[in-house]
Amino acid sequence: MAENLKKLAQSESFLSLQDKVCFWANDYQTNSCDQNLNCCIELIEQVAKVQAQLFAILTATAQEGGHNEGVETIKSRLLPLLQTSFSSLGVGKIIQTEIRPIQDFQLRSKNRQSSLDQEQQQSDGDSFIESQPTQVQDDLTESGKNLEGTKNGSAISLLAAEEEINQLKKQLKSLQAQEDARHKTSENRRAEISRTDRRPSGKRNSERPQDVVSNYEKHLKNLKDEIAVLSAEKSGLQASHRQTRSRSPSPGPRGPRGPRGRRRSRSHSRSHSRSHSRSHSHSNSHSNSRSNSPCTTVAKIRSPSPNRSKMSSVARKAALLSRFSDAYSQARLDAQCLLRRCIDRAETVQRIIYIATVEAFHIAKMAFRHFKIRVRKMLTPSHVGSNDFETAVSDYIVCHLDLYDSQSSVNDVIRAMNVNPKISFPPEVDFCLLTDFIQEICCIAFAMQSLEPPLDIAFGADGEVFNEAKYRRSYDSDFTAPLVFYHVWPALMENDCVIMKGEAVTKRGAFWTTVRPVMRCRSRSLSPICPRSRFGISTVSRSRSPSPIRCTFARY
């Protein structure tokens, strides 16, 4: 191939091709048409000779490359050129003569590739056949291991079953021995009973009817007490109904205190009749009946229905939570309206209501403890040796929650508020304005102590870290302040879980700037009747004496 290439490089036709093209280009304008055509044909003939030599060199080069080399180059570059560039017959003959070796080379390469593929498939099949026995052997060993493990597991389970059978046999023997001993003891008891039956048993026969009669008498006494309570309730309701029907409306304009005084007179008559009937029916068990002062105001009196004990704890809890929520949303706002007529500062009003709520819970819990002690003393003689004594005490308390002396608790709360240094204000204002609110909170707190577990309010102190789990900030708070300035409403807790969130006011730096030395507060004497004007402002000056400084933290 190298010799042919050297001959082509030194051939006259290849060397004179460039010179002829240059001469033709220079003489093209002066030559005639025939002369130009002759020049062009001469160049084509010379180029054809060069191409024939190049194809010979191409064939030799492809043969030197072997079966696989140069195939892609010929396919991608030479074949498209041959299809588009040469259309004349003479050139076609030359191409056919030169292309045949290339086609033979392509055919040989295809045959070679197919033979290589067949050899590869055959080698793969031989390797699979060789690896199949080893795979079968591995499967056999694995199945043998599984069989051995199953055998060991079955042996272990068999041993466990045998051990369990032995234990059951031992238990059966012990039970048989116990049964034999029981039969022997029963036979001995029968023999003793038969011996004792021969003795006179008049005394024993006389004791049994006495026990039955005493039980019937206790049951009859309880029924009579319930009947007396219900009859007193009925008579009180009938009397109040007759009074309301006999009372005619006045033609003139009524004063602002008319409806409130009328409601208080009705509640006073009802409470008086109920307390009188209960003191009559429970004279043996209750030594002190409820006091009925002229200023007694009962916010919500619940009838002592016998079905009260049957009410589930969940239903009572839901009702009390609803009452507590109503007290926050309605009764608290009413109390604020009353106090705002006398006090300008909203902070002082909210502090007064919060302290009243805390004191009411504290006093109600103390009253519940004393009430439970009295119930225990009363029920002890009739439940001696019984296992359900605590259940009986709880049922009695739930059934007789209306025996709670709420007015006495209201008086105690007002006394505690009078000596609290945080809410000292001018003497023209009296805490008797909050009697209805305090009485409602006391009744709610007293009833919450009868739940299982009881509900209580969370401890709160000014300056404590704000807890989002217990309180929500009021609308006028600084939402970036970390400390509580003062509390608006306490949080309701069940053990350590928050049932209802309270409300607190947070202000950054306000707690330290408003701290002032604690002054001695002036105690307020509490009279049964609170003289007030239209808005609860006292028109009669009352004597006040200095009292010692008390701890300002909330009591629980």
UniProtKB/Swiss-Prot annotation:
Residues 257-283 have a biased composition (Basic residues). It is found in: Cytoplasm, Cytosol; Mitochondrion outer membrane; Mitochondrion matrix. Residues 152-184, 210-243 form a coiled coil. The modification Phosphoserine is found at S13, S85, S123, S127, S154, S157, S303, S305, S527, S541. GO terms for biological process: mitochondrial protein catabolic process; mitophagy by internal vacuole formation; positive regulation of cardiolipin metabolic process; spermatogenesis. Residues 129-138 have a biased composition (Polar residues). Residues 179-214 have a biased composition (Basic and acidic residues). Belongs to the MIEAP family. This is Mitochondria-eating protein. It comes from Rattus norvegicus (Rat).
